[in-house]
Amino acid sequence: AMLRDRWPGKLMLKGPISPSDARHAVSLGVDGLQLSNHGGRQLDRAIAPVDLIAPVREAVGPEVSLVVDSGVRHGSDIAVALALGADACSIGRAYLYGLLAGGELGIDKAIDILTDQFQRTLHLLGMRAAAELRAHGRELLVAP
């Protein structure tokens, strides 16, 4: 709450690990949540961020921004995250691999690959846009 009192801008919290953590953060004035397992480095047995999306979205409602930043390796991972209730995904490894392989052009290529994979996933689901996925995608997901 002290940080919220000192910062007038948007405030995002990274790393809530339960819906109750998320609710508490929102009650303290947080505008958005970044669901992360910190690359699996700090606590390798923590719940996967993808498994938190739906329960956290249900806990905090549609007004709070949800960004997923772990486990995004393929465009279909982005589709699943959006279908479960995320507003966006952050990527780390994909663009770093692109950078290492081809510099700036490699980054562009990595983003193009993710975009193509995401679009293909939408089309295979019979959808044209992310908005359709957000509205109807959850019913298409099958539990692993």
Question: Where are each of the predicted segments found?
Answer:
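Alpha/beta enzyme core
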Residues: 1-68, 75-97, 130
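C-terminal helical cap(s) of enzyme catalytic domains, especially alpha/beta-barrels
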Residues: 45-58, 99-119
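Alpha-helical hinge/cap motifs
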Residues: 70-71, 126
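Charged C-terminal helix
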Residues: 116-144
